[in-house]
């Protein structure tokens, strides 16, 4: 028989840096999950990724206080900021441009996010990421 699901928790956790401090500790503590067990499993699962890379994580908590988690790909905005070499997006994206990315960089981002994108083909996925870049004030070349 399948376990009864008690709830879901969605968090963005830095790769390899999960610890019991906020926001992880309080979120898991409310559901009665063993916080250190999650931190150890998450850090082991993200040990092959760049430390500090924000990983959106969906944790399923069961009624017996056990858990499973699914890791998604890093947010497009983070990957775009990294590719453009900027600290943050523009406050006024239509007038003030803060960085520049080209098609090759967008293709790399699409390959990273491939599993989480719902686009039909590569060009549609690139256009999706390019739209995110434009809304951040990043100039897109070659699209």
UniProtKB/Swiss-Prot annotation:
Keyword GTP-binding attributed: no
Any single biological process term in GO: translation
PTM remark: One or more lysine residues are methylated.
Gene Ontology annotations for the cellular component aspect, listed alphabetically: cytosolic large ribosomal subunit
GO molecular function terms noted in the UniProt entry: large ribosomal subunit rRNA binding; structural constituent of ribosome
The keyword Ribonucleoprotein belongs to this UniProt entry's keyword annotation: yes
Keywords on record: Methylation, Ribonucleoprotein, Ribosomal protein, RNA-binding, rRNA-binding
SUPFAM superfamilies to which the protein is assigned, alphabetical: Ribosomal L11/L12e N-terminal domain, Ribosomal protein L11, C-terminal domain
Signal peptide per UniProt: none
Alphabetized PROSITE patterns for the sequence: RIBOSOMAL_L11
Cross-referenced CDD domains: Ribosomal_L11
Similarity comment: family membership: Belongs to the universal ribosomal protein uL11 family.
Subunit structure of this chain's protein: Part of the ribosomal stalk of the 50S ribosomal subunit. Interacts with L10 and the large rRNA to form the base of the stalk. L10 forms an elongated spine to which L12 dimers bind in a sequential fashion forming a multimeric L10(L12)X complex.
Main function: Forms part of the ribosomal stalk which helps the ribosome interact with GTP-bound translation factors.
HAMAP family xrefs: Ribosomal_uL11
PANTHER family in UniProt: 60S RIBOSOMAL PROTEIN L12 (PTHR11661), LARGE RIBOSOMAL SUBUNIT PROTEIN UL11M (PTHR11661:SF1)
Name of the molecule in the record: Large ribosomal subunit protein uL11
Species of the source: Psychrobacter arcticus (strain DSM 17307 / VKM B-2377 / 273-4)
Lineage: Bacteria, Pseudomonadati, Pseudomonadota, Gammaproteobacteria, Moraxellales
């Amino acid at each position: 028989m399948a376990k009864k699901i008690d709830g879901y928790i969605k968090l963005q956790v830095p790769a390899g840096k999960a610890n019991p401090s906020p926001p992880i500790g309080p979120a898991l503590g409310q559901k009665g999950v063993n916080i250190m067990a999650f931190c150890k499993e998450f850090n082991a699962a993200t040990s092959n990724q760049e430390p500090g890379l924000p990983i959106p994580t969906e944790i399923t908590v069961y009624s017996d206080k056990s858990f499973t988690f699914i890791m998604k790909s890093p947010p497009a905005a983070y990957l775009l900021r990294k590719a453009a070499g900027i600290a943050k997006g523009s406050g006024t994206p239509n007038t003030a441009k803060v960085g520049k990315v080209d098609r090759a960089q967008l293709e790399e981002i699409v390959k990273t996010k491939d599993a989480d994108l719902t686009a039909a083909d590569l060009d549609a996925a690139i256009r999706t990421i390019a739209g995110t870049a434009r809304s951040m004030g990043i100039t897109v070349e070659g699209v």
